[in-house]
UniProtKB/Swiss-Prot annotation:
Induction profile: Induced by extracellular autoinducer AI-1 (Vibrio fischeri autoinducer oxoC6), in an SdiA-dependent fashion. Repressed by glucose. Induced at pH 5.0 in an RpoS-dependent fashion. Very poorly expressed in both rich and nutrient-poor medium due to inefficient translation (at protein level).
Keywords tagged on the record: Repressor, Transcription, Transcription regulation
GO biological process: negative regulation of bacterial-type flagellum-dependent cell motility; regulation of single-species biofilm formation
Protein name: Putative anti-FlhC(2)FlhD(4) factor YdiV
Listed InterPro entries: Cyclic-di-GMP_PDE-like, EAL_dom, EAL_sf
Consequences of knocking out this gene: A double sdiA/ydiV deletion mutant leads to decreased cAMP levels which inhibits quorum sensing system 2. Repressed by glucose. Unlike the case in Salmonella typhimurium, disruption has no effect on motility or FliC levels.
Gene: ydiV
Naturally occurring in which organism (per UniProt): Escherichia coli (strain K12)
SUPFAM superfamilies: EAL domain-like
Pfam families in alphabetical order: EAL (PF00563)
Family, similarity comment: Belongs to the YdiV family.
CC annotations in GO: plasma membrane
Length: 237
């Protein structure tokens, strides 16, 4: 996708791996970077997303969906899930247009990722749009603990998977109270979702500290993102 702000930028997609405690690949998050045409300038993705029109939101989502479709045999063969970021604009289109929704439902390995800053997340199942989405698609909360919402949507069972925010993990792990605190969180949200993931696993030291807590999966800079042409390297040990 190409977009013009003060300059012309193009999008590049990468697969950010998600691994279990044995470092076996269980899924990926599809992330997008925006760079200038010559590749010398990168602009924050959040800044680009904030300036997209509804049509551009869907264009970007469609391009990401096409990329995942091109790799579907890889995901099916290795029994992996793939997270695709869901913006409110795309959510509206999925709810209002059956042809858009039907296309996505063809690929059950795709899960839709939202963050705590998603509009009206605090309403939980009282948010009719979010409830409707959760009844049709697997939803993932990507940054629990970022401090932008309550846990009502989690307790209402709207998410298939919940990932603890990377900054939350990295800040709390230095405290003596980390173990009882994390175990209390796990006990609270385990009945509400199928999978709890720890983000922010950026070093071997953090990995060693987090492993005893038996999270279902882990994500962080310890396992860097790869471009689409290197996706098969993610399952090589």
């Amino acid at each position: 996708m190409k977009i013009f702000l003060e300059n012309l930028y193009h999008s590049d997609c990468y697969f950010l791996p998600i691994r279990d405690n044995q470092q076996v690949l269980v899924g990926v998050e599809l992330i997008t970077h925006f760079s200038s045409e010559d590749g010398t300038v990168r602009i924050p993705t959040s800044r680009v997303i904030a300036q997209l029109t509804e049509e551009q939101h869907w264009q970007l989502f469609s391009e990401q969906l096409e990329l995942l479709k091109s790799c579907q045999h890889f995901f099916i063969q290795h029994k992996l899930f793939a997270w695709l970021n869901l913006t409110p604009q795309v959510a509206t289109l999925l709810l209002e247009r059956d042809n858009y929704a039907g296309e996505l439902l063809k690929y059950p390995f795709i899960e839709l990722l939202i963050n705590e800053n998603y509009p009206h997340l605090n309403e939980g199942k009282d948010n009719r749009g979010l409830l409707s989405l959760s009844q049709v698609y697997p939803l993932v909360l990507g940054n629990l603990g970022a401090g932008n919402s309550t846990m009502k949507a989690v307790f209402d069972g709207l998410f298939t998977r919940v990932m603890l925010d990377k900054s939350f993990i990295q800040q709390q792990i230095t405290h003596r109270s980390f173990e009882p605190f994390i175990r209390a969180i796990q006990a609270q949200i385990s009945p509400c979702c199928n999978c709890i993931i720890a983000g922010g696993i950026d070093t071997a030291e953090i990995l060693a500290q987090i492993t005893p807590f038996d999270f279902h999966a882990l994500q962080g800079c310890l396992w860097p993102a790869v471009p689409i042409n290197q996706i098969t390297t993610l399952v090589q040990r």
